[in-house]
A protein has these predicted regions:
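Single conserved hydrophobic/aromatic residue that forms the stacking wall/gate
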Residues: 1-14
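A short LG(V/I)-centered, amphipathic sequence patch enriched
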Residues: 23-40
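Alpha-helical linker/hinge and terminal dimerization helices associated
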Residues: 25-26, 47-69
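Central regulatory/effector-binding core of bacterial HTH transcription factors
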Residues: 73-135, 205
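A late-sequence structural motif
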Residues: 88, 239-277
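Hydrophobic hinge/microswitch elements
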Residues: 111-124, 130, 184-241
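Flexible hinge/capping segments at coil-to-helix
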Residues: 138-175
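Secondary-structure junction motif
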Residues: 159-160, 174-195, 262-266, 270, ...
Length: 277
C-alpha cells in the first residue's frame, strides 16, 4: 500500500493492478488518483493501520528466525516515557548494548498512554513508562523501580525554603506542569482535587526535560523526580521546597502484551530488566 501511495506516473503497474483488484473485492475506494500520484482515502488509511501492525509482527518473526538464538543480530522496539528513560532505562540500555552490540535498539519517545497504545497495537515489543499506567488484558504491567518527586522553585523562591507549604497554599504561586493529556497531570490533578484545590498550571511543558529549565527561569514551582533535580538543588540553581502532605511514590513499570511473541533479543532484555528489580 505504501509503495503504491509513493509511486508516481505510470510506474509500478503491477502494484497498481493488484490494488485495483483489492478495491474491487472490498467494494471500497482506497486511493484518490491525481496527475501527481495517489493518496490514501479514509478507508485506505484504516486498512493500512491494520496491515502495518500485521507486517510489523511478520517482519519481527522473520528477523527472529534468521538471527537464531545467538543474539549477534536482531532488534528491539521499546516505547519509553521521558522520565522512565532518564531515571531508569539509560543504565539498562548501556549495559545491554555493551553485552550485545549487534542488537539494534529502536527507542520511541511516548507519553505513558501513547506507549500503552503502541504495545496494544503490536507496533513495539514493550514499553517502559511511569505510573499511573492503565492497562487491560492481554496487556500486563510489572513494577520495576519506585521513585519520589519533589517540589522545586527558582532562586526567587528561596524565602519559602524554611516553610512547609500545603497543597492548598501552592495554588497561590505560579505552577509548571506537564500537559493535560499526560498521566503526570492526571496524577497531580487527582492529588489537588483530594485537597479541594484545582490544578491550573500557568505553564504547561511538553516533556519532563523542559521543566527544570523553566523552573530555573523563574516561571514557577514544579514537581519533578528527585533524581532529575538533584544536581540543580546541590548547585543551588533551584530550591527544594517542603510539603505538609506526603506525596505518593510513583513507579517505573514494564508494560507488555502476554500474547505478543518476542524475538530472542527482546526476551533477553526483558529478562534482564525484570530480574534486576
Amino acid at each position: 500500500i505504501r509503495d503504491v501511495e509513493r509511486s508516481r506516473g505510470l510506474g509500478d503497474v503491477y502494484k497498481r493492478q493488484a490494488m485495483n483488484c483489492l478495491e474491487q473485492q472490498l467494494g471500497r475506494i482506497l486511493f484518490v488518483r491525481t496527475n501527481r500520484g495517489v493518496q490514501l482515502t479514509r478507508d485506505g488509511e484504516q486498512l493500512y493501520s491494520y496491515v502495518e501492525a500485521a507486517m510489523s509482527q511478520l517482519l519481527t518473526a522473520e528477523d527472529e528466525l534468521a538471527d537464531g538464538e545467538n543474539l549477534t543480530h536482531g532488534s528491539i522496539a521499546i516505547g519509553v516515557s521521558e522520565t522512565a528513560l532518564n531515571i531508569y532505562l539509560l543504565d539498562k540500555l548501556r549495559a545491554f548494548h555493551m553485552a550485545y552490540p549487534g542488537i539494534n535498539l529502536k527507542i520511541y519517545n511516548h507519553s505513558t498512554p501513547q506507549a500503552v497504545d503502541e504495545v496494544k497495537n503490536g507496533s513495539i515489543d514493550f514499553a517502559v513508562v511511569t505510573t499511573p499506567a492503565d492497562v487491560e488484558a492481554p496487556l500486563k504491567k510489572i513494577m520495576l523501580q519506585s521513585y519520589r518527586e519533589i517540589l522545586i522553585g527558582g532562586t526567587t523562591f528561596f524565602s519559602l525554603k524554611k516553610q512547609k507549604l500545603s497543597i492548598a497554599e501552592i495554588r497561590n504561586y505560579p505552577m509548571i506542569c506537564l500537559g493535560r493529556e499526560t498521566m503526570t497531570f492526571r496524577f497531580y490533578d487527582r492529588i489537588f482535587r483530594e485537597h479541594g484545590v484545582e490544578l491550573a498550571p500557568d505553564t504547561e511543558a511538553a516533556t519532563t526535560d523542559q521543566i527544570l529549565p523553566l523552573v530555573k527561569c523563574e516561571l514557577g514551582l514544579a514537581f519533578i523526580p528527585e533524581l532529575m533535580a538533584r544536581e540543580a538543588v546541590k548547585n543551588k540553581e533551584v530550591v527544594k521546597l517542603s510539603l505538609e502532605e506526603k506525596l505518593p511514590d510513583r513507579n517505573v513499570c514494564l508494560v507488555y502484551d502476554c500474547l505478543h511473541p518476542l524475538n530472542e533479543a527482546a526476551k533477553q532484555f526483558k529478562k534482564i530488566i525484570v530480574e534486576s528489580r
